[in-house]
């Protein structure tokens, strides 16, 4: 709390009127900021500034260095989010960024930038918006790389504020809308200068929508008319603009100058673009009258620089008159010219301007540049600025400049003419007023004595009225035609949007309106509390035409004729020459803001727009102020413009004309001949006409020289502008160099301090190092001792481990001994029960021993009495008894231990026997499981075998049928010869079947057709064998040669029936006569099939399981088949089931049908 109270006292002392106290407190704060790293002090300063607006606190905050920049930005970001403090904190931010701190590059990464953009997107307070936009414009050149992240936000803000300028809410003061419009133009200028490709793309996409077209036409298009085509639009791209490498080589002022180069506005463009500031240097001259009717800015049709002129320029002319007096054209319309003495030699404006002989022929001058200043000042070449008596040889009136041409006029011409529009006459000369375009329609002819510039055409017209009526009518017709051309272009004014006059629009009021506003301006200037400029601007807003955007001109002080006013004006010009304001409000404008102070964003206009021109203005102003203080009469003459020289020329001509009239020998000089209807003498008229013609020729010559000098000046002005820009750049670089030198000095001082501090720290480090080295050595010594001790302990530990290992071994042995001892104890306990008798005997013996001991004692006493020494003998006997007793005990222990060990061995063997029995049971169970599994697998294999056998049997039957058909077809030609043999064979088969088989024969009749189409008789084709019979073949048929189709049928039949004749007791299968022979492959296969068929029928009744494995069955298949054939050779009368061996069927063998198989014979 004490510290907070101390900070409060110091803050109150900051606003002290004593400069020393203030400096001391500021130094204390800076030292505190350098020493303290926390945010508390910065937050306190920000809060105090927001409460009091203290300038010393502002100075401290704007000079903060790292690391307090983060604290300041965080605090500003916090207050930006609050509506109550948003305006004040944005003003503070503007002051901070305006000074371009060293940590300005951190602004792009700080959270303050998104908060500022959000505020500009959502806030509705026009003052806050204006301040925020100006702050953003100031920050953009410092953080150009932020465009890659926030470029769309910048464009959205521009689109929102441009439409805001068009909507113009009624609750907002119009002056603030004017300021907002100025800030939007500055934002347009900055975005177009930095990101032209992206910005033009945004404008194309955003304003191509129907709802934004009006905003484009009213706001954005006039802005675009005042910028050049950016080179990046041709050579660059969107990605290149956002590339950070583009901005690495550019400083902040480089970015600002690059943006300024693309402007066409003479008051906004950079100095090298032909900007002339002579109108700002006119503070050393007494200002002309501010009558709007004499202003060259008001004519939009004939004004050469009308496209870049603003109503603020005419408004400034209105305010150039002192507040306490009316404009001269209104207050003293009949003031007469003060005649000057006629010089001995012919007076020439070129001599007054200090010009030499003009350059060569103007043959190359374009037609539109022949009379630039006459266009710029609303005069024509035909003599609107000359007497009305100009002969017809004068050049014809130049056509008025169209509005489009004026808008798109050359920047060089605009810069060469527009700045000269406000130049003032010499302080020693009276006020002169250039002629207005519509003066001839409004002002009646004045008296001859009124020789002001405005009354000069009437005066000259009175002089020329004595000419003949034809010439007078011609002149009046020419004047009327010229005036009609001027007034026709101004006849249809368009009321601007919003009903107020902003400085971004052109003014083309009619003459009566200008007079009204001029009078109003003079009336306001004469009041006690004069109203500010914008109040007079607001009054004539409804009468102004549709306006075009133009930038803000730097301010100019109000006119004051008195010397005190001159001093005040010079002082104000010196102090505020670089403080532009949107409306160029003079110091009295503070009344409009209520508090008597400038708006909070006024200081930001200096950095929002290019300031090269402002620096040039300040430099030239200082030079001219010095010249005015030294010799204003002589020094200011060369600075006069050609138009002022032309005014002086007309003044000189009027004076010469009056002197010539005074020299004439007229009867009465006061007689007005034209008034009385007469005519003056011819010689006087001729003299006057000659002199007037001479004067007109001189004016034409001077105009020609002025044009040539203007061309030359424009060429030189470009060089001067570039030189001044380079000087300004050098000055900026020098300032930057000075700042860097200051920084270098500061860093050198800090380096020295740091070096001293480093030396102290080095000494402290050395002492600490020595101490640490000694400590390290001590610790190393201790470590070595501890290491030795640890080694000793390690060896001891190893010994202890070895001892423990030995002890464990001994423990195991001891445990074994204990086990044995326990066994022995158990045995001993058993034996002790058996040794009770031995104990009784021992007790008895002990009793006897006691008795004998007593007897022995008696004997000993007797011996002692007899003195014999028997102690040795007794001791030896005792030791002998003891040893024997110990021996017996040890023997007993051994016996007990052996008994225990044998018992334990018996127990172990019994346990092993039980385990083995258990294993045998498990193996038996496993064998039973294996047997059951094998039997299951065997049954599955047999079932598969049976199924495969049936399938094979069916296939073989089909194959045999096919082979039989083939053989039958081959034997058709010999079938007739074999009928007899076939019939006999059939009878024999029938006889055999009736004797040995109880089954009926199934005959198979075959019908065969011969080659001649005859039908053959059918023969039985097969038999069904008995259940126990099996068809077998003899060994002779198995060993016989292969049957071939070439064999005769008789041989085949004889060989086929040989086994049947040789074995009468065996069952003979019933065959068909058409079957193949027994020696052929088909015959063998047929026999095997019949045998297998009968075997399968018998197997269905007697199927048993075989104990052998499937593999053994398959190996012994052939032998079992032969055995089965021998067993089945039974009589058909007594069939019986086959043996169990008949269940084993041989493996199926598929062979070539053309070969014989001896195993299946």
UniProtKB/Swiss-Prot annotation:
Keyword Phosphoprotein part of the UniProt annotation: yes
- Composition bias, kind Low complexity: at what positions? 303-336, 1026-1043, 1103-1113
Residues covered by region (Mediates interaction with WDR45B): 403-784
Compositional bias (Basic and acidic residues)? 471-484, 1004-1017, 1114-1124, 1152-1161
Instruction: State a GO cellular component annotated for this protein.
Output: lipid droplet
Q: Where is the composition biased (Polar residues)?
A: 509-529, 1064-1077
Question: What residue ranges carry the coiled-coil annotation?
Answer: 721-849, 879-917, 967-991
> Where are the Phosphoserine residues found in this chain?
484, 502, 508, 518, 592, 595, 1094
Keyword Chaperone found: yes
Note the SUPFAM superfamilies from the entry.
ARM repeat
Q: Name one Pfam family in it.
A: Hamartin
Keywords attached to this Swiss-Prot or TrEMBL record, sorted alphabetically, are: Chaperone, Coiled coil, Cytoplasm, Isopeptide bond, Lysosome, Membrane, Phosphoprotein, Tumor suppressor, Ubl conjugation
Write out the biased-composition intervals (Pro residues): 393-402
Post-translational modification as stated in the protein's UniProt record: Phosphorylation at Ser-502 does not affect interaction with TSC2. 'Lys-63'-linked ubiquitinated at Lys-30 by PELI1; the ubiquitination promotes TSC1/TSC2 complex stability.
The primary site where this protein sits is: membrane
Question: GO annotations under biological process?
Answer: adaptive immune response; adult locomotory behavior; associative learning; cardiac muscle cell differentiation; cell population proliferation; cell projection organization; cell-matrix adhesion; cellular response to decreased oxygen levels
- Tell me what topology the record assigns in the membrane: Peripheral membrane protein
- Cross-referenced InterPro entries, in alphabetical order? ARM-type_fold (IPR016024), Hamartin (IPR007483)
Task: Show the segment(s) annotated as Disordered.
Answer: 296-336, 353-591, 1003-1077, 1092-1161
Tell me where it resides.
Lysosome membrane; Cytoplasm, Cytosol
The GO terms describing molecular function are:
ATPase inhibitor activity; Hsp70 protein binding; Hsp90 protein binding; protein folding chaperone
Q: Glycyl lysine isopeptide (Lys-Gly) (interchain with G-Cter in ubiquitin) cross-link position in this chain?
A: 30
- Notes on the domains: The C-terminal putative coiled-coil domain is necessary for interaction with TSC2.
Its function, per the record, reads: Non-catalytic component of the TSC-TBC complex, a multiprotein complex that acts as a negative regulator of the canonical mTORC1 complex, an evolutionarily conserved central nutrient sensor that stimulates anabolic reactions and macromolecule biosynthesis to promote cellular biomass generation and growth. The TSC-TBC complex acts as a GTPase-activating protein (GAP) for the small GTPase RHEB, a direct activator of the protein kinase activity of mTORC1.
According to the record's subunit comment, the protein's assembly and interactions are:
Component of the TSC-TBC complex (also named Rhebulator complex), composed of 2 molecules of TSC1, 2 molecules of TSC2 and 1 molecule of TBC1D7. Probably forms a complex composed of chaperones HSP90 and HSP70, co-chaperones STIP1/HOP, CDC37, PPP5C, PTGES3/p23, TSC1 and client protein TSC2. Forms a complex composed of chaperones HSP90 and HSP70, co-chaperones CDC37, PPP5C, TSC1 and client protein TSC2, CDK4, AKT, RAF1 and NR3C1; this complex does not contain co-chaperones STIP1/HOP and PTGES3/p23.
What is the name listed in the Swiss-Prot or TrEMBL entry for this protein?
Hamartin
Species of provenance:
Mus musculus (Mouse)
